[in-house]
């Protein structure tokens, strides 16, 4: 809400506001009348009829022909053709590979390359065999170690079983044997020497 300025000032402002509103209302009514009268005087063109074509018309049923491109324009490779990598040339550039016209020299080169590849394959096979032998040897060593452990384990088991069965008999017999074989020792007398 707006702050109140006082009773006298509000009365004056109301009077001036009423004068302004009455003058503005007459102007507004005139402008309203003039606009509406202008609209009545202006003639509108009659509405045009828009004719729609039936969908069954032949022109709509016909499909527009699209342009068909040839294989050369699309730069498509020929189908069912296996071309070696060296033969394929990139567009607009020369390939740096030169092929031999003589068939025999071509075959010798091929034989050399194949021999190298076979050698590599053979070396891989040899390495695989060596690795397999190493694995087999390690496996055997591990098995031997496990057998030794089992053997030691079984021995200790047997020893413990024997000790349990015999109990204190063996220990007492050993003590008796030790005492009978060695004469009893005399206790050493302590001597003190004066300088």
From Swiss-Prot:
Bias (Basic and acidic residues) ranges: 46-60, 136-159, 167-178
BP GO terms, sorted: intracellular mRNA localization; mRNA transport; ribosomal large subunit biogenesis
Chief place where the protein resides: nucleus
Subcellular location: Nucleus, Nucleolus
Basic residues composition bias: residue spans: 186-195
Keyword vocabulary terms for this entry: Coiled coil, mRNA transport, Nucleus, Ribosome biogenesis, Transport
GO molecular function: mRNA binding
Single GO cellular component term: preribosome, large subunit precursor
Annotated stretches, region: Disordered: 1-74, 136-195
Coiled coil: 124-166
Biased composition (Low complexity): 7-40
Task performed by this protein: Required for efficient assembly and nuclear export of the 60S ribosomal subunit.
Oligomer and partners: Component of the 66S pre-ribosomal particle.
Family (UniProt): Belongs to the LOC1 family.
Name assigned to this protein: 60S ribosomal subunit assembly/export protein LOC1
